Amino acid sequence: LDTTMKTNFKNISILALLAMTLVMMSCGGEKKRKDGRTDTTTQGEISFACDESFSPIIDELVEVYHMQCPNTKLKPIYTNEIDGINMLLQQKTWLTITARNFTPKEYTYVKDGLNMLPEAVRLAYDGMALICNNQNLDSCITVNDIKAILLGKKTKWSEVNPGSKLGEIWVCFDNRKSSAVNYCCDSILGGKPIDSPNVFAAKDSKDVIDYVASTPNAIGVIGSNWLNDKRDSTNTTWNKAIRVMSVSKLDKATPYNSWKPYQAWLLNGRYPFVRTIWALLNDPKRGLPWGFAHFIESPKGQLILFKAGLLPTRGEITIRDVQVHNQ
């Protein structure tokens, strides 16, 4: 009897050990995939690429997502547009937030070359803002003037406004490979390269603002979300040395036909330089990158974008004209 009991006990122990091993293997298979990822939409840690010009609003969205899903950790890598998209194509990240969609060649590469399904999520619209020093009285400018300046056909302020004494025009971008540079070449210049000796690139949007604040004859090119970054004293809302330029589609710019990159003028088409913010995904597992991108396009994410001064892509938006009558 003792021998039988020992044998049975031994068999039971072996079966229990096998069962525990199978459970552990099963759990491990669910938590850790073949690619090493363990993230889901509500837990885990990932890095993602983002155009530096969107850093103020992305920081805010990440903060809200962390509060909503406390078991997640999102780490944005702020870079330029070209490097950010290359990171996605090289599978160094599963999400890139930038100012353009996949090109047909990029889409085909991800779909056929990597055997994955690329996804592009339209998040919001922002304006390509032009800022100048507060000492510059020429705060209204035409689209044609901007084209001529970027092509090097106009290099002095007196060629824009005959009465100006500011001298040469210096144009500062955030990065030579940024979405702002690409937007100007593709959308403003119709595919032509910037060809002016007076155009240069700084390190980032903050440096552009600092440069314009200290240079009376400069124009800075930044994303309009920097106009409302209330956490940073260098932003144009609080920086009294900076003013936002108004842009006109007509041949002569006046305060009555020129518009700034604010939501109402983006919506009705009066401001000419509008770009789309995209979330480009290569996330077949639909994990944390997918969850964060679709959080931004959710009603809560769209409201955050709206309060930050961007124009959401989803939801009904009504801009009402208010008439004030003197009594």
What annotation goes with each model-predicted range?
Residues 1-4:
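Short, Lys/Arg-enriched N-terminal segments with co-localized hydrophobic residues
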Residues 23-26:
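C-terminal motif of bacterial Sec signal peptides marking the signal peptidase cleavage site
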Residues 81-113, 228-232:
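Pocket-flanking alpha-helical
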Residues 115-119:
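Periplasmic N-terminal soluble interaction domains immediately after the signal peptide in Gram-negative
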